[in-house]
Amino acid sequence: YAMKRTLVPEILAAYRSLALENDIIVIEGAGSPAEINLHENDIVNMGMAKMAKAPVLLVGDIDRGGVFAQLYGTIALLKEEERAMVKATIVNKFRGDVALLRPGLTMLESLTGKPVAGVLPMLDVDIEDEDSLAARLERRKGDAVLDIAVIRLPHISNFTDFAALEATPGVGVRYVCEASSLGAPDLVILPGTKSTIADLRWLRQSGLEAAVKKLAARGVAVIGICGGYQMLGMRISDAEGAEGGGEIGGMGLLPVETEFANEKHRTRVRGTALETGGILAPLSGAQLEGYEIHMGRTLLSEDATPLVRLENGMPDGCQKGNVYGSYLHGFFDSEGCREAILGALAAQKGVSLQAEPFDLKAYKERQYNLLAKRVRENIEMNMVYRILDAGV
């Protein structure tokens, strides 16, 4: 918290880089712009809007209740120069007849001096949304023929890795945080994490490490992604103190060792799937792409089997029997990759998934188009465009 203001030059550099490439930039705030106890060092709401000299649309979530108090109270608590930057309000996630809201909207406009740009109804669209993460974690699919258990680590990251699996017909994805609820899935996934060592300790203390190892010994496929891959190895060392220092033994399911470093590796990658066995065998020779974001490096033993040969010639990932690990986020987004893995799991189980391929990109496009259509129908877009043209 104390270092937030020191990040401003980096934030401005990122903003200016985006501004060189785009005509319109949408800046999404975080939480409320009227947290008066945090106002002085704000860099994500009105603070960012001031840095970018951006006009503001204030959006209130009516589904949580008290939307008029939210909008009026927020504007009242802003400083005068910030109130002037707010050009209009929007009511989001409304259920019911908008006519019932109109008297309140008229009063809100009178009280704030700001027009209401529209009322967006609650929409049934499948779009990755951090604000609905809790509901997503509890979601169940009644028609699932394949059961995939993702270990819900305390510092789990990159939920988007599993969106493609969640959207695939016939595939059920559960997020598991207790050994007693792990059950007998067809596939266990150890996801990425913002704190590998702390989450490995939690995995051990919760009994989930033992439960996952028991399933692996019975032949259940286990895949680790990024931090999950690191956990599956023999050892993790943190000589530079990236996560507090020290060393910890891994789960011992893959013949690899990880050495942390303070510098984070971030890059988009492409590669070719190597010849392996088990559920990844159908991928041999397939072109894969994704991105890496991790600290340090993972070293394979001499007799280890890598999963992917990257374009730069380096290996990625490792396989031993029915256990697999990789640094590639977005592993399941590739249609061919996902279909091959799910098809192999279905064949092992003796069930069949739908015959028609599931086109994730087309599915996502339909969801975004539906959202755009509803926004155009319910928001006064001409007002929004005028606000954009006028600026602050």
PLM features per residue range, with description:
Residues 1-51, 62-76, 81-83, 96:
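ATP-dependent carboxylate-amine ligase catalytic core
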Residues 24-26, 57, 90, 189-191, ...:
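Structural motif
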Residues 39, 61, 68, 72-174, ...:
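C-terminal lobe/tail of nucleotide-utilizing enzymes
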Residues 47-48, 108, 214:
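Hydrophobic/aromatic ligand-binding patch that stacks against planar heteroaromatic rings
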Residues 52-55, 84-86, 249:
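Short glycine-/polar-rich loops that comprise or flank the Walker A/P-loop
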Residues 193-279, 284-289:
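Cysteine-nucleophile active-site neighborhood
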